[in-house]
Curated annotation (Swiss-Prot):
GO terms for cellular component: cytosol. The keyword Cell inner membrane does not apply. Belongs to the class-I aminoacyl-tRNA synthetase family. GluQ subfamily. NCBIfam families: PRK05710.1-3 (NF004314), PRK05710.1-4 (NF004315), queuosine_YadB (TIGR03838). This is Glutamyl-Q tRNA(Asp) synthetase. GO terms for biological process: glutamyl-tRNA aminoacylation; tRNA modification. A motif ('KMSKS' region) lies at residues 249-253. It comes from Symbiobacterium thermophilum (strain DSM 24528 / JCM 14929 / IAM 14863 / T). L-glutamate binds at residues 5-9, 41, 193, 211. Its cofactor is Zn(2+). GO terms for molecular function: ATP binding; glutamate-tRNA ligase activity; zinc ion binding. The keyword Metal-binding applies.
Length: 323
């Protein structure tokens, strides 16, 4: 059975781009008669705010979405908040370490920033790590440990190309070493995003991941982790981003683009869903509609392949103006 999910990070309020991703992931699962899971990705507790997790649940319910498993309804694969799943991540870390797939990295933030400022040093996933600490001898590692430096742990990329067919973006091919060895455990003890999301999706039985196109470059790293952990690799679909009228990523300067702000303006959820469906190519006019009414017309082939700008008049209408 197909299983999809939506996994917001509670470091900010859900905006229209998040809502579109949630809606399309939900429709994809429901169209196939599958399961849908809500998970809260609050692994970085310093950046996460519990009230924003509660607000996200309320916003999604208001929009008309439901889920078979989640933090508010429970289910057989809980807990559904990453902050409560650390033991599972530690187990995965131990397995990877025992198989020699990880190594300690002692590079400072300043050194990593220097890498980022070098030509071709920055990828969409951050600085492309050149493998500095991967080449350290045992003696050099002991010397750094003696200096009291707490290392992060990096996953050593194997020398292999990663190719897959994205459900939306089509065939993808990444050369060996793309993006560089990545962190799976930060020096401050926080589990890396790449590992946490793979462990969660694997243990929750997620078969299809629909998410924003900004995460496309994460996919080869996650595929390697699935393989290293002996888990099936899900199908991935990366949605072109929803942008502001100026072509920039959605931000406060674009107006009331959060669901909380739109709700406060008195806009109906059906109006929001109608506009999101229109911007996603599912309907011909941005007319009010409930999510369940879109299930029969949902088709991944109808989704635009390029980023979509929200017209200024649409934002004005959702903010309480006239359409």
């Amino acid at each position: 059975m197909l299983c999809g999910r939506f996994a917001p990070t509670p470091s900010g309020a859900l905006h229209l781009g998040n809502a579109r991703t949630a809606l399309l992931a939900w429709l994809h699962a429901r169209r196939a008669g599958g399961r849908f899971i809500l998970r809260i990705e609050d692994i970085d507790r310093a950046r996460s705010r519990p009230h924003l997790a509660e607000q996200a649940i309320a916003d999604l319910r208001w929009l008309g979405l439901d889920w078979d498993e989640g933090p508010d309804v429970g289910g057989p694969h809980g807990p559904y908040c990453q902050s409560e799943r650390e033991e599972l991540y530690r187990d995965a870390l131990a397995r990877l370490q025992a198989e020699g797939r990880l190594y300690p990295c002692y590079c400072s933030r300043a050194q990593l920033m220097a890498i980022a400022s070098a030509p071709h040093g920055l990828t969409s996933e951050g600085p492309a790590y050149p493998g500095t600490c991967r080449r350290l001898t045992p003696e050099e590692r002991r010397a750094r440990e003696a200096d009291g430096k707490t290392p992060s742990l990096r996953f050593a990329l194997p020398d292999e190309e990663i190719a897959f067919t994205d459900l939306i973006a089509g065939p993808q091919r990444f050369p060996p070493g793309a993006g560089g060895d990545f962190v799976v455990l930060r020096a401050d003890g926080v589990i890396g995003y790449q590992l946490a999301v793979v462990v969660d999706d694997a243990l929750m039985g997620v078969t299809h991941v629909l998410r924003g196109g900004d995460l496309l470059d994460s996919t080869p790293r996650q595929i390697l982790l699935y393989r290293a952990l002996g888990r099936p690799v899900p199908a991935f679909g990366h949605l072109p981003l929803l942008l502001g009228p100026d072509g920039a990523r959605l931000a406060k300067r674009h107006g009331a683009v959060t669901l909380a702000g739109i709700r406060a303006a008195g806009t109906s959820p059906e109006t929001v869903v109608g506009h999101l469906a229109y911007l996603s190519g599912l309907v011909d006019q941005p007319e009010p509609v409930r999510p369940e009414e879109l299930i029969p017309v949902f088709d991944l082939a109808r989704i635009p392949r390029e980023p979509v700008r929200i017209p200024a008049e649409t934002i004005a209408a959702l903010s309480g103006g006239t359409a």
